[in-house]
Amino acid sequence: MAKIQMTTPLVEMDGDEMTRILWKMIKDELILPYIDLKTEYYDLGLEYRNETNDQVTVDSAEATKKYGVAVKCATITPNAARMTEYNLKEMWKSPNGTIRAMLDGTVFRAPIVVKGIEPCVKNWEKPITLARHAYGDVYKNTEIKVPGPGKAELVFTAEDGTEIRELIHNFTGSGIIQGIHNTDKSISSFAHACFKYALDTKQDLWFATKDTISKKYDHFFKDVFQEIYEKEYKEKFDAAGIEYFYTLIDDAVARVMKAKGGFIWACKNYDGDVMSDMVSSAFGSLAMMTSVLVSPSGVYEYEAAHGTVQRHYYKYLKGEETSTNSVATIFAWTGALRKRGEMDKLEDLVTFANKLEKATIATIENGKMTKDLALITSLKDVTVLNSENFIKAIRETFDTM
């Protein structure tokens, strides 16, 4: 059988620990037998990041800007323990954070829904994609512990020296104050990424803040979204048969619990941080969550939403068998290959990606799965497979489709 051809390379970012092992298994078993794979390879494993003083991460992001589509393996973000374990020169930053900043991207997370793994919210039938604004607010805050009585003010000093002053509070005793900010550019980029991704996936877009209480800060987010929507996306949304819907964050939470799913929920930074964990947990498993970084210029980077599965890796190093869920990593590959196929008008590549996703889901629904899914499935008499045999079972399903 002739292999499917590619015209433009994918940017391939390799990673760490157990996900790095799965990465090679997935390529060898599910991709290379069928596709004449073209990739520009970057090793984002912690050892090589350390060797290159993290330059490899910057290079991979630049390549993603150049080619437009990347697929990324999970990577270690070092802490004190990792500094010792890997003998690091310094505590390198999160690769995801570096790439996100360089691409000015928004992260969209969505669950992979399969029969037999029911969400905690019984009416959720379709995935809920969560878009989190990843800049500013409480994550770039400045805080002061107030020692005693006094006046707290918010002061903005323009370049020409003029000042705007607002009283925060007249303290009669000790307390706490916090200053947060965001930028027009960052909010606009977030809005464009959300509208583009909604059109791309043909899903309704919800956005929510607390503009009734935060009449300037949150209202600014609301206004930026509305203005960009009216000016650049309303006609496109109408033509696609999808809608943009704004509501208050508390109303959005209430509506989400009663909804059937099948939409994108855009959130400010803190709301997105909290709600993405709620949504992923309620759908059943973080190992069944996809993640795609979308830039306002239309650049895409696909990865699994989970980490490097450190515990399984240490078992693997001892020669012990692991049953590690590779579904989200497989879907990172299919997402990237599909997008590459769409951009390059390669129907065979798009068809392959869709078929591999269906084969992965069908394998689980036929009762063959990894241990983590066997613990939460409602299916009876399931077969628990090890990491490698699960990937081989997917290939068997794929070949019979």
Question: Which residue stretches match the model-derived regions?
Answer:
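Flexible, glycine/charged-enriched surface loops at secondary-structure junctions
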Residues: 34-41, 201-209, 233-246, 341-353, ...
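N-terminal alpha-helical transmembrane segments of multi-pass membrane transport
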Residues: 2-8, 18, 22-23, 28-52, ...
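Glycine-rich phosphate/diphosphate-binding loop of Rossmann-like nucleotide-binding domains
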Residues: 6-25, 154-247
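Internal helix-turn-beta structural module
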Residues: 318-324, 339-401
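N-terminal glycine-rich phosphate/adenylate-binding segment common to multiple enzyme folds
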Residues: 47-163, 176, 270, 274
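Glycine-rich phosphate/nucleotide-binding loop
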Residues: 256-355, 362-363
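N-terminal small/polar loop signature for handling phosphorylated ligands or for N-terminal nucleophile
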Residues: 46-60, 222-263, 267
